[in-house]
Amino acid sequence: VHRRLLRFFSLLLCGVAAATAATVVAPSSNPEVEVSAVKFANLRAPHGSSGNWYEATIALDVRPVPSTSGRMVARVRVTLTLGFELPAPPGGERRMEFYRAEAECVALETGRSDVRFYLPPELVKRDQLHGDPKYWGVELAAAGRAIPAGRGSYASSLPAAEARKSFQTRAAAGAGINEGLLQPQFLTPFALEYARATPSFVRRESR
């Protein structure tokens, strides 16, 4: 009987330890911020300016943890990377153009928030940009902590982790020559548009 009791308690302790370990390592299935949709459009800027801008709208689903102060997620950084495959010029080859920009939100409340980026009309006209880019990806971080990519964070042309990593590597090497061309909303003529759906941004441009 004594041996049976020892065996029972030993198995019980092992089960508790395993359950505890599983609880500790299990990843959260509900990140604080997640990309729910990304849409692209061509549109004219307000106040009668000429030429179409290329707009990328990133819809974010925000779910602060219950213990978060004010039920907000602070300092959310959104980085958008675009990869366009452009037609070949006469006698040439098709080429890729990469653009990257980021914007940091002061804080996001529970619910939906939209973050927008724009390419100016000169590029839209020169490269005939319209529709979805061939490749795109969105990276998120909150208070300096990277948030794992969700299902809506990348284009359908990048279904696998290896393809996404390759895209980010190529973009890191190729986006430098286009630095500053993809612009967050607050640096464009659309700064005062979508007032109800636009969060406040951290501003770091030189004065």
For each feature predicted by the language model, list its residue ranges.
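Hydrophobic h-region of N-terminal signal peptides that target proteins for export
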Residues: L12-A22
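Surface-exposed extracytoplasmic segments
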Residues: R63, S67-T68, A143, A163-S166, ...
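A structural detector for beta-sheet-dominated domains
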Residues: A41, R63, Y118-P120, A141
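Bacterial N-terminal signal peptides that target proteins for export
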Residues: V1-L12
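Short, compositionally biased P/S/T/A/G/V-rich stretches that sit at domain boundaries
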Residues: A22-S50, A171-R207
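Internal, hydrophobic beta-strand segments that form the core of beta-sheet-rich folds
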Residues: V76-G83, E122-A173
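Contiguous beta-strand segments within globular domains
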Residues: H47-V65, S69-R77
